[in-house]
Amino acid sequence: MSSRSPTSTPTPSFAWPLLVAYSLLVCALHFGGLQYEIYTRLWWWDLLTHSLSGIGVAAWLCLLPVTPVDATRLVAVPLVVLAIGAGFEVYEFLFKDFYVEWTTAYYAFDTAVDLVVDFLGAAVFTRWYGRRRQSQPSSVLLSSEPAD
């Protein structure tokens, strides 16, 4: 059973293929960055992939039918993304020896930066999403009905 109210606007069918394509692009950037050692050649690559990941996870959270997206709960989305990012950082720490040899101090700094960028990416998306819902509640992006 969905936790959205009956008056919530449905997500249009074209949003899902776009979100899946976006997610695949972010995965390709991440794993391509590992495979071709882009992370070590471009200092900003990690920032790019984490900010794009934060945007993508926030989009999934906002567009899933079981996720309530009223203004009060919209504030929580970046915090949930931060928690998911923290989980990923634990995974990364456990398996880092396979692809990188960092000191613990450097890893702690990198983790902090990654989590900030995850949070900022999510905050950017939720701010855009919240404003879009507020200004155009029946917009083409957020509803299957045509815009007024």
Predicted segments, located by residue:
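Bulky hydrophobic segments
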Residues: 1-109, 119-148
